[in-house]
């Protein structure tokens, strides 16, 4: 099985398991609640991102993903990272309004998973050729979510199968988008060690 097929099979399996329990949403995993509102938010290169230092990692990730600026302009629509007690450090509220997208969470963990949900709502072109996208319309909605399981892991056996560094980076990125929080990396098998280290034989 090729590296690409492994990722495709993993995503296919997750999707079908979700369908088995009545899943009917493009958000994986299905959030605790999702309420649609009237109106749309227009995401473009002019959209600004507003955040405090507590949410810098998630905000910078989103900025790089969308390839937009982080300066505040009162005349443009905004994505705001805001603190709110959720009673779960990985929980979040994603509020998409006509003029603003508000991401509420207790800390950077919850904000990061909110960004992954927002990422899933965007067309696949954002994952590849962002430069071709001038503007995208997001329906107004409020999404609330928190993980049902504290440990959410995925395994990758590199002792029996060889993978490139680029593949492993993409694999971890896919796990993050699906809100896994643990990467179980099977590195050794008997005398085998699969990470190249120039200093040691």
What kind of feature is each model-predicted range?
Residues 1-3:
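N-terminal secretory signal peptides that target proteins for export/translocation
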Residues 6-18:
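Sec-dependent N-terminal signal peptides
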């Amino acid at each position: 099985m090729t590296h690409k097929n492994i990722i495709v099979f993993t995503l296919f399996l997750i999707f079908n398991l979700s369908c088995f329990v009545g899943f009917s949403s493009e958000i994986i995993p299905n959030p605790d609640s999702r309420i649609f509102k009237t109106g749309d938010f227009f995401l473009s290169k002019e959209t600004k991102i507003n955040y405090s230092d507590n949410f810098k990692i998630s905000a910078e990730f989103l900025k790089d993903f969308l390839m937009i600026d982080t300066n505040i302009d009162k005349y443009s629509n905004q994505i705001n990272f805001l603190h709110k007690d959720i009673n779960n450090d990985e929980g979040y509220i994603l509020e998409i309004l006509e003029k603003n997208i508000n991401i509420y969470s207790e800390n950077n963990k919850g904000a990061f998973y909110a960004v992954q949900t927002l990422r899933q709502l965007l067309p696949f072109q954002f994952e590849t050729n962002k430069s071709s996208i001038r503007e995208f319309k997001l329906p107004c909605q409020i999404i609330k979510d928190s993980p049902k399981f504290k440990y959410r892991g995925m395994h990758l056996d590199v002792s029996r199968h060889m993978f490139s560094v680029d593949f492993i980076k993409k694999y971890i990125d896919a796990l993050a988008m699906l809100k896994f929080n643990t990467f179980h990396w099977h590195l050794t098998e008997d005398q085998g060690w699969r990470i190249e280290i120039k200093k040691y034989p």
